[in-house]
Amino acid sequence: MKKYLYIVAMLAFFAGCTKAPEQDRAEELRNRILEGKTDKVLVVAHRGDWRYAPENSIAGIEHSIKVGVDVVELDLQLTRDSVLIIMHDATLNRTTTGKGRVSEWTLDSIKTLKLKNGAGIHTKHRVPTLEEALLAAKGKVLVNLDKADRYLDLVVPVLEKTGTTKQIIMKGGRPAESVIASYGDLLDEILYMPIVNLYKDDARQIMEGHMALLKPCAYELTYRTDDELDYPLQLREDLSGKALLWYNTLWDTLCGGHDDDLALEDPDAAYGFLIDTLGATIIQTDRAEYLLSYLRSRHLHD
């Protein structure tokens, strides 16, 4: 009896010493965004870091995770047999060894093709489905599904099947009322971020609607030139401590010329300007490793 009690006591002791499961990286990143403030800058790899691997490929996702990217941006297309795949263009021509519209090919046929790299050379990599991409990213990185609202009724079941709903970012340029009507309760699960082109006539109205109705955790902002800085500067002040600010450095007219190309010559004038002057806390880039190196040199990324 004493031996039995001893064993029970030891089992209880070791059970008490067992640590709770650690929070996965995607959950930690999600919580950081939900807080609406951070002393770091999050890095988004556009089309899954296409400079390293074919765009929208599993290899690109895996490399992004390896180097420390926080969000991978992926694009969706629908096959003839209604399967969501990861691809930017509506046609296969540019990024694969096939030709024609994605919507005219079945998944089985698309899986026979090879992805091309940035130079247009075919590789060993294949076109991934949405499900395959989400499983590669699960628990490791947040995923921005671009223009997912086109296929929302098909996307949601895949998110649920893979258990990745809470690591998904969706964005769009519609007014808050339209977003609420389309997304409904899904807004409680995903991270939704409005896209606001600050140079447009209705920009202030769109922003005010989102601030009042949705209160998003982050906003994607674009502007064309530094002659348009008044409103971006105002938003930095208005949203400080309330929401993160996402800027794109993919090309010049998204960020007033402070883009990836300028960053190769002067990263302080590009990335540094967006961070220090406009309060950028999320940057989407086509040069993820270069941006990460810059941020780490300033202790703005782990």
Q: Regions from the language model: what does each represent?
A:
Residues 17-302:
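Phosphate-group recognition and catalysis centered on beta-loop-alpha active-site segments
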